[in-house]
């Protein structure tokens, strides 16, 4: 039945390919004999004829265009606007990835200072795939809650400790991945909100430093800004960076959630003269960082490298990693115990974390999701008796208060978010981060597109987002009946059997045990 009633597109294309040159001739004759103005149509159809001839007989790349001609181009045009059509007209509020419309809207509202209360009921799925937070029959009174604070470096007793006084920090985003207006907006907003910002692995943080916020300098595998020509660490360059008043901590990036086992990638389209100078890399080619630090060949050399950075910088030093194998992580912890050398914090990056550019094969298939990875890391630290020797941070799609509170229940001391703050700047999830064509000017170095970011306005939105996230944090904490995040545990979570976390938790521990 369908074969008889369906449209034969190939026949339509053949008919179209015949009609276009015929109409060209018809309008030419009409313009010659009837009215000169018909030659406007002659020019139009002659142009179509030439384009059609090129598609069908000259170009050899696209088989569809060789068979269907100009009519086949309609398919490519529809495909190119498909993401926009789905996002704005067809996808429901809870369908899109990595963040659906409901999740993005909550961030937008918090950034604009608009009440994010909803009506009628949740759009979440209350089934075996949703982790929920268990409330108490006896919520904690507001005046009984302990103000949030976490101090990095206190375990080692160093002089240059660093304290977070708000339950969120801006995760690693470099100048290069972001444009200068976006970096300055985030840094100015971080300063106003009193939170720290990670510089990312982009070398000397010129634009991060302009706004005076507390910074965490990230040392990537390429060591941009602090390297010798052979890619090894230049201690003097690192010492100079660490001496900047705004640099409060150093973070050694071992791996990243969106591309674990793969070095960072900055597409050549985004490498300006300035970025080339700041990173010490040539223009005209993609900048691909090594897969690992050349100094880190095994657990022993990795721990020794951590100690080296601590000695050179005289600052709190953490490591960032995406967990692949928990046994491998345990071997690293065992070596820390043996050498009595510990980082001041470990940042656990979930496989669902974001990036400006990464191979899709890595983005889709490698790394442990945040929650099981975080639980595994904290459990190993406890089993090895060293949980009190360092802090644990968590990152990976933590843009809303619910997932952040789950991370705290799983043992995190502090939370990182990157894409949450990008959304505060107006990110529309166009998925153009690596193409230098970001339509709102966040992840581009095109001066015209960057003009969309007004630093003063966006900095205020960053501040609003932090204020409203903190408000929700204390409300959710109070509902658990606890006084501080240090009292939270997995017993404060309902973890259904269908979640990736369930197999790592003891049976019934999250359901029957009193919170």
Regions found by a protein language model. Give the residues of each.
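Conserved, well-structured core domains of diverse proteins
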Residues: 2-168, 172-196, 202-212, 217-229, ...
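Internal alpha/beta core interface subdomains
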Residues: 180, 184, 193, 197, ...
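A glycine-rich phosphate-binding loop feature that marks nucleotide/adenosyl-phosphate handling sites
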Residues: 206-208, 322-328, 391-401, 482-498
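Glycine-rich tight-turn/loop motif centered on a GG-T
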Residues: 217, 221-225, 268-297, 356-371, ...
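Phosphate/diphosphate-binding loops
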Residues: 227-253, 369, 379, 390, ...
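Carboxylate/His-rich catalytic cores and anion/metal-binding grooves
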Residues: 244-267, 326, 331-344, 348
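Glycine-rich phosphate/ribose-binding loops and adjacent secondary-structure elements
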Residues: 288-450
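Active-site or pore-adjacent capping/gating segments
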Residues: 428-490, 496
């Amino acid at each position: 039945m369908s074969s008889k009633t369906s449209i034969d597109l190939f026949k339509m294309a053949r008919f179209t390919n015949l009609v276009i040159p015929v109409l060209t001739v018809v309008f030419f004759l009409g313009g010659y004999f009837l009215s000169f103005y018909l030659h406007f149509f002659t020019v139009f159809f002659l142009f179509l004829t030439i384009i059609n001839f090129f598609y069908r007989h000259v170009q050899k790349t696209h088989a569809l265009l060789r068979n269907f001609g100009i009519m086949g181009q309609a398919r490519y045009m529809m495909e190119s606007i498909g993401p926009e059509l789905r996002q704005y007209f067809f996808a429901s509020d809870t369908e899109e990835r990595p963040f659906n419309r409901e999740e993005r809207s909550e961030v937008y509202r918090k950034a604009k200072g608009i009440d994010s209360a909803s009506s009628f009921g949740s759009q979440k799925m209350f089934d075996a795939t949703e982790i929920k937070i268990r409330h108490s029959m006896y919520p904690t009174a507001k005046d009984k809650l302990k103000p949030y604070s976490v101090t990095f470096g206190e375990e080692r007793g160093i002089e240059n400790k660093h304290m977070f006084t708000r339950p969120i920090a801006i995760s690693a985003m470099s100048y290069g991945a972001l444009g200068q207006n976006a970096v300055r907006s985030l840094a100015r907003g971080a300063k106003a909100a009193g939170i720290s910002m990670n510089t990312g692995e982009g070398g000397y943080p010129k634009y991060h430093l302009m706004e005076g916020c507390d910074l965490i300098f990230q040392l990537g595998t390429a060591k941009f800004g602090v390297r010798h020509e052979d890619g090894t660490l230049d201690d003097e360059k690192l010492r100079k960076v660490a001496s900047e008043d705004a640099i409060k901590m150093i973070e050694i990036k071992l791996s990243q959630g969106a591309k674990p086992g793969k070095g960072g990638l900055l597409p050549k389209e985004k490498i300006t003269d300035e970025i080339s100078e700041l990173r010490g890399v040539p223009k005209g080619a993609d900048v691909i960082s090594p897969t690992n630090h050349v100094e880190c060949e095994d657990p022993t050399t990795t721990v020794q490298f951590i100690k080296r950075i601590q000695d050179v910088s005289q600052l709190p030093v953490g490591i960032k990693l995406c967990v692949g194998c928990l046994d491998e992580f345990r071997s690293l912890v065992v070596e820390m115990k043996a050498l009595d050398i510990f980082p001041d914090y470990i940042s656990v990056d979930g496989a669902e974390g974001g990036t400006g550019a990464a191979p899709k094969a890595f983005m889709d298939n490698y790394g442990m999701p945040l929650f099981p990875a975080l639980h595994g890391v904290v459990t190993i630290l406890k089993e090895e008796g060293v949980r009190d020797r360092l802090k644990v941070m968590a990152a990976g799609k933590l843009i809303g208060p619910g997932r952040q509170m789950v991370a705290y229940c799983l043992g995190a001391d502090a939370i990182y978010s990157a894409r949450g703050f990008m959304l505060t700047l107006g990110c529309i999830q166009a998925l153009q981060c690596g193409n230098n064509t970001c339509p709102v000017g966040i992840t581009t170095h095109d001066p015209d597109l960057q003009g969309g970011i007004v630093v003063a306005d966006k900095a205020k939105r960053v501040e609003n987002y932090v204020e409203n996230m903190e408000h929700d944090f204390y409300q959710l904490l109070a509902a658990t009946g606890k006084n501080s995040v240090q009292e939270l545990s997995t017993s404060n979570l309902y973890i259904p059997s269908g979640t990736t976390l369930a197999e790592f938790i003891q049976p019934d521990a999250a359901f029957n045990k009193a919170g």
